[in-house]
From Swiss-Prot:
Cofactor(s) the protein requires to work: (R)-lipoate
Compositionally biased tracts (Low complexity): 165-177
Pfam families in UniProt: 2-oxoacid_dh, Biotin_lipoyl, E3_binding
Reaction(s) this enzyme catalyzes, per UniProt: N(6)-[(R)-dihydrolipoyl]-L-lysyl-[protein] + succinyl-CoA = N(6)-[(R)-S(8)-succinyldihydrolipoyl]-L-lysyl-[protein] + CoA
Residues forming the catalytic site: 394, 398
Annotated ranges, domain Peripheral subunit-binding (PSBD): 128-164
Protein's name according to its UniProt entry: Dihydrolipoyllysine-residue succinyltransferase component of 2-oxoglutarate dehydrogenase complex
Biased composition (Basic and acidic residues): 99-115, 153-164
Pathway where this protein functions: Amino-acid degradation; L-lysine degradation via saccharopine pathway; glutaryl-CoA from L-lysine: step 6/6
Sequence positions bearing N6-lipoyllysine: 42
Alphabetic keyword roster: Acyltransferase, Lipoyl, Transferase, Tricarboxylic acid cycle
Length: 423
């Protein structure tokens, strides 16, 4: 019978975690239909079946780590049903065989998983629940057998919430503290919450530590007077929206264009080390950090040197929406040359951003704060000021070049007409 294997994803991705089975055992599967969601280091991707039939075996469970090329499901012949629970009663031999196989798999799982994902001898007694409900139940330690479905005899997430909100039975009340004490006995007097890190969070933690350990990272600072760029934006924003189908003119396009100009002037900032070689990139794919519920993601705006302000703004907006809706593809997340992060949207006045992997530097933007500035010896004016930071790999970039790069950014933002002329 045809197997479904973890597909090739990207050069830097070798494994993933099964986030959710989108199909239950016994469900009908169409050719090209997604059967599970796989969480990778960068994005979540759906794995599809290359054959039509029935999902006859799940060779891995939600939460399991699987490698590229590994078989994770078997597609059998037949039309299938809405779920395994509604399978035909006239195939007892097949049901017994499936039950025995399921028992073997269950004995190899941890006690906690077995409690939630238990399989009875009779398939008809197996709890009918949506994949997301099974995952939610496992994360919250809820036994699905104790949950009463509201509609169609299928347990859903809201049924689990209702079960948790209901007054607990005496047995449950007595059992819960014992489990808590066993799990958190190293914190006997203080309340804590322990939860498993997501794959993306674990990967981010690992890579951030690798960058800190494997680069000679240093940060230099400067400040930018935002007066001129704010006035230009105020004058042009309405006409800009009319001319470009509602696309808004923001500050990111100015900083992106300024970064491209500075990268051309200081090409070592657009480089990376590969073994004993230094690779200087001749393209300008700028990463823009986007905050999501799953953490910080860095999709890339491609060929920024060839795009105008409107195209850059539209692409940034599109990538931000895709990131928050979890629709980013792997192509959006790899092979960038430089990154910009804006901590100012969260109120950060100053920071030392960490370099993105396979890059030599990252530009940090911050809050715009009005403060008194000495214009000359006799004049002090309140000006909208922003601190900017450049974290860089000192193995590649000397201090002189780093300071010069940041000074170029400052000069271009303070004289935005020069950016418009360059574009």
């Amino acid at each position: 019978m045809p197997e479904v294997k973890v597909p090739e994803l990207a050069e830097s991705i070798t494994e993933g975690t099964i986030a959710e089975w989108l199909k239950n055992l016994g469900d009908s599967v169409e050719k090209g239909e997604a059967i599970l969601e796989l969480e990778t280091d960068k994005v979540n991707v759906e794995v599809v079946s290359e054959e039509a039939g029935v999902l006859s075996e799940q060779l891995a469970s939600e939460g399991d780590t699987v490698e590229v090329g590994q078989a994770i499901a078997v597609i059998g012949e037949g039309s299938g049903n809405a779920s395994k629970e509604n399978s035909n009663d006239n195939t007892p031999q097949q049901n017994d065989e499936t039950t025995n196989n399921k028992k073997e798999e269950t004995t190899n799982k941890s006690a906690d998983k077995a409690e939630v994902n238990q399989t009875n001898d009779d398939n008809q007694q197996r709890v009918n629940a949506t994949p997301s409900a099974r995952r939610y139940a496992r994360e919250n330690g809820v036994n699905l057998a104790e949950v009463s479905p509201k509609t169609n005899d299928v347990v859903r997430k809201e049924d689990i919430d209702k079960k948790q909100q209901a007054p607990a039975s005496t047995q449950t009340t007595q059992q819960a503290p014992a489990k808590e004490e066993k799990k958190y006995n190293q914190y006997p007097t203080k309340p804590v919450i322990r939860e498993k890190m997501s794959r993306r969070k674990k990967t981010a933690a690992k890579k951030l530590l690798e960058v800190s350990n494997n680069t000679a990272m240093l940060t230099t600072f400067n400040e930018v007077d935002m007066t001129n760029v704010m006035e230009l934006r105020k004058r042009k924003k309405e006409q800009f929206m009319k001319d470009h189908d509602g696309t808004k003119l923001g500050f990111m396009s100015f900083f992106t264009k300024a970064s491209v100009a500075a990268l051309k002037k200081y090409p070592e900032v657009n480089a990376e080390i590969d073994g004993d070689d230094m690779i200087t990139k001749q393209y300008y794919d700028i990463g823009v950090a986007v905050s999501t519920d799953d953490g910080l993601l860095v999709p890339f705006v491609r060929d920024c040197d060839k795009k105008n302000f409107a195209e850059i703004e539209a692409e940034i907006a599109n990538l931000a929406v895709k990131a928050r809706e979890k629709k980013l593809g792997l192509d959006d997340m790899v092979n960038g040359s430089f990154t910009i992060t804006n901590g100012g949207i969260f109120g950060s006045m100053m920071s030392t951003p960490i370099i993105n992997g396979n890059q030599a530097a990252i530009l940090g933007m911050h809050s715009i704060i009005t403060r008194p500035i000495a214009i000359d010896q006799d004049t002090i004016e309140n000006r909208p000021m922003m601190y900017i930071a450049l974290s860089y790999d000192h193995r590649i970039i000397d201090g002189k070049e780093a300071v010069g790069f940041l000074k170029t950014i400052k000069e271009l933002i303070e004289n935005p007409e020069d950016l418009l002329l360059e574009s």
